[in-house]
Amino acid sequence: MKSEAKDGEEESLQTAFKKLRVDASGSIISLSVGEGPSVRASARTAADDTKPKTMCASKDSWHGSTRKSSRGAVRTQRRRRSKSPVLHPPKFIHCSTTAPPSSSQLKHRSQTEPPDGISGRGISTPKEFNAGENSTSLDVNHTGAAIEPLRSSVLRLPSESKTEELSDATQVSQESLTANDLSDFQSVSKLSQGKPCVCVGKECQCKRWHDMEVYSFSGLQNVPPLAPERRSLEDYSQSLHTRTLSGSPRSCSEQARVYVDDVTIEDLAGYMEYYLYIPKKMSHMAEMMYT
């Protein structure tokens, strides 16, 4: 009998806890409950202060697991598991030596640029163009450097056309105010837009065109020398050619063979090896696919 009564009491307590909402502070708010056992349970919990705090402090802390009130509001950054580096977009640092049109249109410094005029790549840039005097002096130095090779090229020419060339040189010096530097191809081509080259019809004495390397090809410098078989094939084709000049006309196949000897299949295979390197594994896989 006692055990049955205890079971009944436990059931009534459970139903009471289901129908009661208990705050974290321990104050009990009874929902509209008309049953007898629930009222009795609320009276019992009010009388016994120690039980409700341990058993039903709040809905979040049932089963001993404390749950955060704001679930998705503050979420900490999870540590990256992958070993690949985090790639950030590149930060461009613009540095040029030409003067800005006015002091109001100053260039905004990028945040990554260090304070003492040294850009991220280690190139020392001019401090900053706040004062117009610094920039103008820089520009004057540039134009002086630009005019010197021009004058040297002008002085070499014959004396008849000297006055004409001096006027050309002054015009070019005015244009070189806009050009950054004579070392790059674009600025030199801008310089020569005004008038045609002074030395048209004579030997070109414009020094800066000869010193400039517009395009540099690196791929064709490492070509292997001709194989000995190729040389022997060339000799063979020449002997065939001389033989046919004296003797009977050749057949079509012979003519074609002489023509092909110029660029042999071995050369083409070497070209494939050197320039279109196809890995062995890949070609094997391709063979397996297509057979």
From Swiss-Prot:
Keyword rRNA processing recorded: no
Modification Phosphothreonine, positions: T143
Compositionally biased residues, Polar residues: 95-105
One GO cellular component term: nucleus
Amino acid composition bias (Basic residues), ranges on this chain: 65-83
UniProt entry tagged with the keyword GTP-binding: no
Keywords recorded for this protein, A-Z: Phosphoprotein
Top-level lineage group: Eukaryota
Region Disordered: start-end pairs: 29-139
InterPro entries, A to Z: DUF776 (IPR008494)
Pfam family, one: DUF776
Protein name per its UniProtKB record: Oxidative stress-responsive serine-rich protein 1
Organism annotation: Mus musculus (Mouse)
Gene behind the chain: Oser1
